Amino acid sequence: DPRLTLRKAMSGGGDFSALVRRDRVVRHPPVVALCDISGSMTDYTRVFLHFLHRLTEDRRRVETFLFGTRLSHVTRALRARDIDAALADVSGAVQDWSGGTRIAASLHEFNRLWSRRVLGQGAIVLLFTDGLERDSDGSLAAEMERLHKSCRRLIWLNPLLRYDRFEPRAAGIRAMLPHVDEFRPVHQLASLEDLALALSRPALRADVDPRHWLRRAGG
């Protein structure tokens, strides 16, 4: 159970090694993670990959993709049982760590090549990015809309929500917000615990409703 694992990690100084499982067998919907590994996300990527590694062990149907300036499919690497080995395999499979970001282009590649293969059976998409897009051709909104229509739930995880005075002013953020079901922080273990709970018991809270932020953005 990822939520109980995170609780143990919080009480044990960040140790993710003990995965807590529940006896009751639950058939979870597929989870597809799209993770921004650009320079602006560096401080958060490793912790989120730890979370995905445990989620991959706990659930049968988890697919993970990383993107900076290109899209990389790293599901097989994350299936290594040892977390250090898994992260080493992921690092070896990706060439654009901590560089620039092209969100629209990466989503276009996913939508074109992978969407039909991994988004069936009510899949939940976890989009891990700050939304600071560098492309300016206006395609981001269209790619987000296509992604949203292809999945059951699209959850945007944005570390910028750690700021009390955060405002959705950046063009990329404004383009993406209308096409997500939940808008969540992802800057600490407590926020990942909330995410684990949301994956198990979906219920939209007011504080993660994107409509709140759309109103603030004037959308």
Identify the role of each PLM range.
Residues 33, 64-66, 127, 156:
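Structural beta-sheet core signal
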Residues 144-219:
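Von Willebrand factor type A / integrin I
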Residues 1-29:
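Negatively charged sequence features
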Residues 135-138, 194-195:
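Extracytoplasmic/secreted cell-surface and envelope-processing proteins
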Residues 32-46, 71, 132-135:
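Short acidic, Gly/Ser-rich segments with clustered Asp/Glu that frequently serve as metal-coordination loops
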Residues 30-32, 122-126, 153:
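Structural motif
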Residues 84-123, 161, 165-168:
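Von Willebrand factor
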Residues 21, 43-46, 50-102:
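Metal-dependent catalytic core segments for phosphate chemistry
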